[in-house]
């Protein structure tokens, strides 16, 4: 029975659990009001060209996740309409990474920022 449960859990696991690809965000911990937040997500264990879309999300204190936007490895982007005027997401295939820039930040942008695929 233990083997059956393990099998069921493995099959039901999200794609990212089964993958060896790892994502690591980097950037400043603090940004001054009206400044620009710049974050980079390094992809390891696989090529950034192997997945269709790479995303940024954030979680404000005490709130749920908010989707910021996504980029295709070719450079095509989709953005959250509420943030679109302030967001730029770019990809650097030579460095196997993608980046987020959020301009004109305010206290309302306080959040934990995550990259995802």
From Swiss-Prot:
Location of region: Framework-1: 20-44
Highest taxon in the source lineage: Eukaryota
Disulfide links within the chain: 41-115
Organism for this UniProt entry: Homo sapiens
Signal peptide boundaries: 1-19
One BP term from GO: immunoglobulin mediated immune response
Residue span of region Framework-3: 78-115
Region (Framework-2): 54-70
Source organism phylogeny: Eukaryota, Metazoa, Chordata, Craniata, Vertebrata
Complementarity-determining-2: annotated span: 71-77
Residue ranges of domain Ig-like in the record: 20-117
Swiss-Prot/TrEMBL keywords: Adaptive immunity, Cell membrane, Disulfide bond, Immunity, Immunoglobulin, Immunoglobulin domain, Membrane, Secreted, Signal
Localization annotation: Secreted; Cell membrane
Main location as per UniProt: secreted
GO molecular function annotations of the record: antigen binding
Region described as Complementarity-determining-1: spans on this chain: 45-53
Protein name: Immunoglobulin heavy variable 4-4
Pfam families named among the record's database cross-references: V-set
Function according to Swiss-Prot or TrEMBL: V region of the variable domain of immunoglobulin heavy chains that participates in the antigen recognition. Immunoglobulins, also known as antibodies, are membrane-bound or secreted glycoproteins produced by B lymphocytes. In the recognition phase of humoral immunity, the membrane-bound immunoglobulins serve as receptors which, upon binding of a specific antigen, trigger the clonal expansion and differentiation of B lymphocytes into immunoglobulins-secreting plasma cells.
Assembly, per entry: Immunoglobulins are composed of two identical heavy chains and two identical light chains; disulfide-linked.
Region (Complementarity-determining-3) location: 116-117
